[in-house]
Structures are given as C-alpha cells and as structure tokens.
C-alpha cells in the first residue's frame, strides 16, 4: 500500500480523542428507556402457534446477523470482539453497539462511538464497494441491458467488484446464502407447526424467496396473511442505502394481533378511495382505483430484529415497497400499539411539558397520537406510485432517489393530518376520542420527539421540513418563553398547501424541486435548537426488552 493512501485511510478512522469514554457512553445509552415488551400469548395462541413462535424468533435472530453484515463489512468481527471484553467499558460498548447494530450512533448523525472504525457509517453501508462513487455507479449502469439495470438498482442485490475490479451484481440469495438457508429452515419448521393456512402459506413462500431471490409471490402471500401471529420478515426498507435508496435491509417483526383494536380501526380502510379522490392535487395525478385489498393490523410486538430493531424503534410500518404489489393489492399497515404506548409515556409526555404552554399540555392525547400514526401509514398507500416522466413509466422512488424517503415520510405525515381533518369535516370520526385541537397539539409535540433524532435520517429531515414550513405560514408560532403553539386559524390551510406541494413533487418525479425544498426547510433552525437544548435528560426513545425469547 502506498503511504499517501495509507495516511488517507487512517485519517478516516475514529481516533481515541473522538471516542466517548464510559461516562459519556452511559449517557448516550440512557437516551433509550429500557421497556419490557409484553403480550398475552398463553390464551391467544394455539399449541401449534406457540411452537411456530419459537421458530420465528430463531429466524429473526438470524436476520440480526444478516443486517449487521449489510450495515458494514467489519460488523460481525467487531461484534465478536466486543463480546469478549468483560470490562465495564467493554460491556457499555457492546450494549450501545447492539442498540445501533453497529459502531455508529444513529442519534448522532451515524458518528462512530468505537475506535478503529470509519468515523461515519459508509453512505452505501455494505450494499456497494466502500470505494465506489455515485458517478462510477451511474456510468456503469448506463452500459447495462435494461434487465441488468433493473437488477442493479433493485431492492435485492448488492454491488461488488469482480477480480478485475469491475462492478458486478450479486443477488442477496448468493451474498447471504448460508444465513438464508438457516433462516429458511426455521421458517419451514414454523410453517409446519402452525395450523393457520395463511401463515403457513406466507412462511413457506418466504422461505422459498430467501433462496430464489424472488419475493413477489411471498409479498402477495404476506398481504393475505390473517393470523394471530402477524409476522414480517425479509428485506424491506431502504433507509440505510444513503447513496440511492435502492437496497433493502433485512428486518423481522414477530407480533401478536390485537383483535379488538384491529376491528375498531378497520373502518379507516373503507374510506381510502374517498380520501384519494379528494387529495389536494390535480385530479390527473389521483389514482382512480386503489389496490383492492388494504388490510390494517393492530398488533403488540413480541420480538423484532435487524433493520426492525436498531436505533429509534419503529412504531408502525406500511409494506411492501414493491410498486407491482401495491398496484395489484395495495399495501398493509401494521400498527405496533405497545411500542407506541411506550414511546408516548416515556418521551412524548415529558417533552410536552417543556415545549408546550401549560394550557396546551392538557390537549395531549394518546388517541390522537395513535390515530395519526395510523393515518400516516394509510397515507403511504395513497398518492402517486406509478408515474409518467418524459413519456417513461417510472415511480417517485426511482426518480427522487436518495431524497425519496424524506419526502415520502413527510408526505405521509401531512397527508395523515389531511385525512383526519377530512374525516372530521365529513362527520366520519364522530366517535373519535379526540378533537381537532388535540390532533394538532399532539402532532406538534410529536414533531419535537421526532426531531430529536436529527435530520440525517429520513424521518427527522422530513419532520424538520414540516415544522419549518408550518412556522413560515404562521400555523405554528414560537412564544417568548421558548414554548410553541398551534394557530388553529391557519393550520388547516397550511397543512393542505404543504400536502399539495409534497404530492406534486412525487407525481412529477421532481428531484430538483425536492432537493430545493429539503435544502431550504429540512434543517434545524436556531429557534428549534433552543427548544431541543431544554430537552436534556428526557429519553429520546425506548430500548425494547423482549419477554418472548
């Protein structure tokens, strides 16, 4: 290795001066409130499902290993090294490594907290060669056939270099073969144990997908899943591909369905087409026929792994991301109720006492918080998905690349507010346990909770954009005492205007417009930073502790 190159590499590694000591590390860990995740499986699961549950958790643990490999090539070796260090510092490092599933702190802009690793998470994680540039990739895919170009930019491949140093495409089923064979075996065993036909079908097809790299049939089967054990396992979200947002990280959620809450909330799905037909966007961009099936599930989390359990915990998700499945069957919304309740109790309530005026604190509502998350997830399934750009059939995700996640998360938040306001205006939520003031006040308090995660991550950047937009419109005001309030005379029209702008960006695949908006609004302004400075000591999120093992 030539000395200049060696010096350049060494300067990229986290140095001892940058690495937190034991006290600092314990302070970082304390930002996550340990929370035991419990649900009654004794009375709600059959003997066969209880056997299946054990095998599903076994498969989920393998997903943890795959995801760590996806995040960084050196992760597994580092994890094993940390486990062998019995010192207090070593134990703290292992603890925080496990929270993040790697040596970079999600809450600190992916900065390293361990020595001897790159000072920041590689933007392309381990989906691409670490020395690959964006320009090299784009030039390379220009030389490929249409089929290979789709594979190179698809969810389920990694990009490697061949013996000559040329970029090449490797399917997940090859890259993670040994791990996926083990996970497929556990899924097959779970499928054999359960007596539920839809769970058996999904697990069997997902096991086959792990080895074939074709997830389409198993995604359709996941849409049809109707079982007490509500399982999500496989490669889904693309947040860790910060270069293009193409590559899916492996995740697992093993959940117990909440039958009572699912029945209560199912009526939302009956009004999705009506909401789509009235979105604040040009009529030509609306979808006249949404997918025929849009199931909603309210569940309690029993176990999560991989991309589903690192850093900030997911409170709900809307999948799959394959536009073919969304067009044919819609998408499924899964609400993790016990996770949401834990976040509300541990973070949102104490935050509200520091950023909201006293009278506004009385408007805080878990029902409003829970229902807006539901509306957020519903909103991922409406709006533009298949679009035309310069005569080409494409999607907002493909056109907006690495900007898509932040825009889509903001669109889901704001469309969720629009949806609930529409339903209130049309007397569709007459039995709701919250009112307009509670909805917008709780949304504002929740925004501060989300913004504490920083703006490096899609959700945080999208939330900063929302708050700054609403403040510029006068819909959110900063008080002299450092608290914030909603102007109820302006917030409805401001939300509608913002929703129009975000939906139009997606409908037109406007990368340049999205970049302008995010660069201008997706930042932490000084007035917001002052508010965050008052939140020290409040946990930022939860650290789930699973009763099911």
Regions found by a protein language model. Give the residues of each.
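Structured alpha-helical bundle/scaffold domains in large eukaryotic membrane-trafficking regulators
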Residues: 75, 222, 456-459
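Extended, compositionally biased alpha-helical segments that mediate assembly or anchoring
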Residues: 495, 499-549
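Bacterial N-terminal signal peptides
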Residues: 4-14
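Long, well-structured alpha-helical subdomains associated
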Residues: 417-516
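Fold-level signature of zinc-dependent metallopeptidase catalytic domains
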Residues: 25-55, 147-423, 427-429, 433-447, ...
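N-terminal helix-rich structural modules
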Residues: 11, 18-202
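Short amphipathic alpha-helical segments that mediate assembly, nucleic-acid/protein binding
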Residues: 6, 134-137, 463
